[in-house]
Amino acid sequence: MYRFTSIARPIDPAYLTNRALLMVLPLLMLLSAGLASLYDIDKGPVAAAFSGALAAFAAWALTRELAPDYSGAAFVALSLAWIANVAFGATSVLLVFVALLIVRLVNRSTGPRWRPLDTLGVLGFCIWSAVSTQQPLLLVVAAVAFSLDATLKEPLRRHYFAAAVCVSVFIWMLLGDVRLIAADLVAWDWVLIAASAGGIILVAATSPEPVSYCDTSPDRLDRARVNAGLVMGWLAAVQALLTDGSAAWLETPIWACMIAVLVSFADRIVNRWPGNTRVG
């Protein structure tokens, strides 16, 4: 696979976390289908099964990129995303997959630099997603991500060009009838955004050197790239709120991923306190 692309990450069942995922997803499908049948949900049991599993998988995959050393966070995100899907109808996963690719672009979790077709494919996907969802700020986030990849360790300079393309399309969208900032954001939304920003800054500032390895080499992930990827994921979530308003909290599982990262961070901090050392 890596002979053709530097983007893909297969779910290798040799790893315990991947085996756990492959066991959990069918169970979630059955639960989603059962709940849809029990409560006579309009989309039906089959659609509910696939929707629930897709939301859970998307959240798991993104959180594995956001916090590669903490596999437990991914399963927290999986659980929250599935609950949000069943209880609140959080079925849209497009933004989650866009964020996943943007984060992977920056943190280089697969190892090698992107091939030209990888760049073109993700660039096109980001543009299409921004236009189809009418979220022009997504292009700003993508531009920052491409610029970071062209700047950080082992830079890929052609991504400056990809960033320029994103900015150009962003300006083109602004010239049309597109809303940049939603009108229904209230003080509480801004408080939550600020609180999440503070949490993400704390996570990045206190994170140790990564212990996870790249997929295709014996090299460990780069701390600056991992932290930059985390910030990119948060920016992707925030831009949806700014454009779509308060409804974006529950439209997509991306905030489940952010919450899972922060919960994982809080758990690590609590367990570092004197008297909280686990024995055995």
Spell out what each predicted region is.
Residues L105, G111-A237:
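Generic multipass alpha-helical transmembrane bundles of integral membrane proteins
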